């Protein structure tokens, strides 16, 4: 039951009560959040504030009905809402400093590990490739080629130029043999031992690995990368490996230990959600919107959508009572348009479905004509008006519609009946009937809720929406 009150609750408040729903106050800011969000740029059916009041009250009444039905206590509701709460709250449990500290820790551990193994080297190489089953003659040819290149380099030949011309490692050859920085354990030991033994600028004699002969030039040496050059990579590693979540869980556990016995991560997250919501109205209303939206969906499903969709007896009764609503101006054809490979199947299709319920036609035809790998008949089923289907237009409505033959199916036909004034059965317009029946159930339900619960709207506060 609705009341319009002339007395404004909390008149001097910066955020006065705009209405009460069953005794529970609704602030002006909450109403504004919902109104502005649902009337933003791009919304087609915009409402005035006064028009929106009824929609908002109906929404709140449905949520109240869901709470009275204890939907908020179900396991499925709790699981879905807590997942959403976690998405909003968990990231706020740690600061960028916490993540930075973890990144520094990972960096220092990697730096120590690499430094202990000899640091990093920056080699370039020229590879003369040898297959694992290379003959002795092939090995000798490769060795001589590598030796020849090495001797040319010792006489001042350009390493990068020779790499581009002769190296069989195409990935590095285009870069003058450069394979960037490596540490121990990143490539084969023979190669590493040679690379780490060189001085910067020095070129190795040809060395043999499982890949073939390498001539290595050392471009540089260092203990490890500077932190700033790998920081972003480490941060990506932290997210990819779930380390951020581990840090959050450690923080939650740490805080829980300072709280009364029985407190756990959920306790801490609830407290954090309350704390954040107290300082951020947008977050508060965003979480409430999700919470109430879950309740609204489930209660609407129970009271309207599922009931309308599943109660075929009620659908039929609604159709019978409102049959005039479903009349159409022009005749429709209820049946099938079909295409066959063989002329004989045109009559066979009609014989197959004649006298059978329309709802069974598709399955009957599938079993008789298309059960094996050869599809003998292609079928389009429905209720067609003029212009919906060229075969129906041509053969039923006798228009000059252009019919394009389906490849491999030269014979077109139709079977069914013309409905002149409207559908004979509710199933002919079932989707339409269900939608209309849902609307009726919705209106009846809302009317019941408006009688069951009392709500008060304060016009003076309503007049200040978005004007303060």
Task: For every predicted segment, state its role.
Residues 12-26, 32-468:
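Peptidyl-prolyl cis-trans isomerase
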């Amino acid at each position: 039951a609705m009341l319009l009150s002339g007395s404004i609750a909390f008149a001097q408040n910066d955020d006065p009560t705009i209405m009460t729903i069953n005794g529970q106050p609704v602030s002006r800011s909450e109403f504004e959040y919902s109104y502005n969000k649902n009337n933003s740029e791009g919304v087609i059916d915009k409402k005035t504030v006064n028009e929106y009041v009824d929609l908002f009250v109906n929404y709140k009444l449905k949520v109240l009905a869901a709470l009275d039905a204890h939907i908020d206590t179900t396991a499925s509701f709790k699981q879905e809402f807590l997942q959403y709460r976690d998405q909003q709250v968990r990231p706020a449990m740690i600061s960028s400093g916490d993540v930075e500290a973890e990144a520094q820790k990972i960096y220092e551990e990697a730096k120590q590990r690499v430094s202990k193994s000899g640091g990093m080297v920056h080699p370039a190489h020229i590879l003369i490739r040898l297959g694992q089953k290379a003959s002795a003659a092939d090995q000798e040819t490769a060795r001589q080629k590598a030796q020849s290149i090495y001797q040319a380099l010792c006489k001042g030949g350009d390493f990068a130029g020779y790499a581009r011309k002769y190296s069989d490692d195409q990935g590095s050859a285009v870069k003058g043999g450069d394979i960037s920085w490596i540490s121990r354990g990143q490539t084969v030991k023979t190669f590493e031992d040679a690379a780490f033994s060189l001085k910067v600028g020095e070129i190795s004699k040809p060395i043999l690995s499982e890949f073939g002969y390498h001539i290595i030039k050392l471009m540089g040496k260092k203990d490890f990368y500077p932190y700033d050059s790998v920081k972003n990579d480490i941060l990506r590693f932290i997210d990819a490996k779930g380390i951020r979540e581990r840090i959050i869980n450690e923080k939650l556990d740490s805080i829980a230990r300072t709280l009364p016995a029985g407190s756990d991560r959920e306790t801490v997250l609830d407290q954090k959600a309350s704390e954040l919501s107290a300082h951020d109205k947008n977050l508060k209303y965003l979480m409430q919107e999700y919470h109430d939206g879950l309740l609204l969906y489930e209660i609407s499903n129970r009271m309207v959508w599922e009931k309308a969709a599943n109660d075929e007896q009620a659908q039929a009764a609604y159709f019978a009572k409102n049959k005039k609503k479903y009349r159409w101006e022009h005749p429709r054809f209820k049946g099938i348009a079909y295409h066959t490979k063989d002329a004989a199947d045109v009559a066979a299709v009609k014989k197959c479905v004649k006298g059978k319920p329309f709802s069974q036609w598709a399955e009957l035809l599938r079993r008789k004509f298309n059960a094996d790998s050869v599809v003998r008949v292609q079928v389009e089923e429905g209720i067609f008006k003029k212009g919906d289907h060229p075969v129906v237009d041509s053969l039923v409505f006798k228009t000059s519609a252009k019919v394009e033959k389906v490849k491999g199916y030269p014979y077109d036909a139709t079977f069914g009946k013309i409905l002149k004034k409207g559908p004979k059965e509710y199933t002919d317009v079932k989707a339409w009937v269900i939608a209309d029946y849902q609307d009726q159930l919705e209106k009846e339900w809302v009317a019941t809720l408006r009688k069951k619960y009392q709500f008060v709207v304060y016009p003076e506060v309503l007049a200040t929406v978005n004007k303060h």
